[in-house]
Amino acid sequence: MKGKHRVGLGALVLVLLMATVAYPVLLYTDNAFVSKWRTLYIETAMSTMSHQWLATAFIPQSIIDEVMQTRAETTELQRTAESTWNVGDVTSAIVESEEIEDDEERFYTLFNELDKKSFESYLEDHEDVLEKGWDRIAIDKCDEESDTGIRTKQGDTVLAISAKQGILIVAVKGETYRGRLAIVKDASRVELKTCEELFDVGQYIKDIAKDEDAILAINASGFIDADGVGNGGTPYGYLKVAGKELQGPYEHGYKIVGFDEDDLMQIGDSNITDNLWDAVEFGPALMVDGESKLKSASSGWGLQPRTAIGQAADKTVLMLVIDGRSTRSAGAT
């Protein structure tokens, strides 16, 4: 019995030591590793609707306020975020490739992100890929999640290539996240679509894609979620589809993003809406005209599932989806 009492007392002493020593250290240390994860923990908890107590229950409000100050500073940076480019600033990747006569050279010019050596190795092992020619190359390993061995020049794994559709899909991963990046070469094919019963009941993306006969789809914006029981039928903020304005801007610190008639993605406020064909309102804007519009990597939002869209200087559209809130992928900053 005495042995059990000693074990119990030892455990109690250990808990007390952790409470009196480890807890203050975790809260106030400037250690880079601890500070990084403390900040991400607070930001992630405070960015939820119903789980903010995970931070407020045992972290002093002063520390929470200090961490969340970066969100306010990012919001201030967002006020001046507005793109300024026009059609004279770009050359289309599609146009550049079409000017080349050799099929192989045209393929590598269009998909300039590909690491040529790794793709050649793949072709050696899969001779059937070229049976219909370079302009009909079609590889799709997205569902299998297997390593194709094909790499981008940055070292990411390529999961799918469609020469006919002008689409490349890449697996992206980091310390806390996994996701997919779709690289779309023809910006004119990117369109904004809505759920069938807009302002009434929402739809899953896969169902909207099926209805519209789309081969690729991602979320465009958030939706009104009153008291956490919204049905996804009403999008958050400005909405313009095929030149028709369906909902006005909210302008609560978010930006309007959309495509103009030259297929250029523009970012700004309500003053740019007349020039847009398709547009939504959300945020934050990450980069505008090549410059960051964030105060820090996380900017007060922590680790979350993410959807992002961007456009390169050659009009290539980048569509990114990051999984989150799972053991496999906590999310990205």
Predicted regions and their residues:
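Zymogen propeptides
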Residues: 3-247
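Short glycine-rich loop/turn motifs
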Residues: 176-181, 253-254, 303-308
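Structural recognition of the beta-strand scaffold that forms the well-ordered cores
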Residues: 183, 215-219, 258, 310, ...
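Short acidic-glycine loop/turn motifs at beta-strand connectors
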Residues: 184-188, 258-264, 289, 311-315
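Active-site-adjacent helix-turn-beta-strand microarchitecture at beta-sheet edges
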Residues: 223-298
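Domain-core and long-helix interface of multi-subunit machines
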Residues: 288-333
